């Protein structure tokens, strides 16, 4: 009997170092046992020490990739990551209107590790107008929350305030990730989960490692894979966070900078 694997999609950038973007997404999909497809929005020259170049693809090539997936695959859920510029965002939004790819998880890659904005203002406006209202789940980190809402999240109250602004922008559900910030250096880090029918906090003990490149990409990809396998949103988020915590606690020693994640560490658990 031929086993049927759920089919999923990532629309994101390519990371030559293999730690984030499309490469991280496909590794997460494979680990979960779902079949991953991809639409590449940009090529990046990067490694564990940094990003050395970003080269957006043409809107024609992005559209062609989406249509190729639409015409041949039964996508159960999909994610979007780095979308580079307003032209690509508009292209993706327009083309997705002709597709039925299931639930969408948007990981809004907007801010570099050094705090620099990766999207220009025009692109941020397009993201807010065209993609936020149609996204099933948004997974921003704190700098991305600030870029979208103007709210500095430091505690439960400010997280709720930020979610209020996101809801005004059309966001239905969000995971506000609290791990990547100087404001939270305690024993635990919080992720604030705001769903249409529930609100809760996921906390995990901090693990002292620099090898966390691609955590945001991997979390959103794990959620997509688990949704495609039939989990509801609440359980998919909780399970993905649990798996990501195990991954971070079992780091790889690859490269000379911020190394990639160890997806092998959860192979026996999924």
UniProtKB/Swiss-Prot annotation:
Example GO biological process: thiamine diphosphate biosynthetic process
GO CC, any one term: cytosol
Entry annotated with the keyword Nucleotide-binding: yes
Catalytic activity: 4-amino-5-hydroxymethyl-2-methylpyrimidine + ATP = 4-amino-2-methyl-5-(phosphooxymethyl)pyrimidine + ADP + H(+); 4-amino-2-methyl-5-(phosphooxymethyl)pyrimidine + ATP = 4-amino-2-methyl-5-(diphosphooxymethyl)pyrimidine + ADP
UniProt-annotated binding residues for 4-amino-5-hydroxymethyl-2-methylpyrimidine: 46
A single MF term (Gene Ontology): phosphomethylpyrimidine kinase activity
Pfam families: Phos_pyr_kin
Annotated EC: 2.7.1.49, 2.7.4.7
Family designation: Belongs to the ThiD family.
Biological role stated in the UniProt entry: Catalyzes the phosphorylation of hydroxymethylpyrimidine phosphate (HMP-P) to HMP-PP, and of HMP to HMP-P.
PANTHER family in UniProt: HYDROXYMETHYLPYRIMIDINE_PHOSPHOMETHYLPYRIMIDINE KINASE THI20-RELATED, PHOSPHOMETHYLPYRIMIDINE KINASE
Protein's name according to its UniProt entry: Hydroxymethylpyrimidine/phosphomethylpyrimidine kinase
Organism: Helicobacter pylori (strain ATCC 700392 / 26695) (Campylobacter pylori)
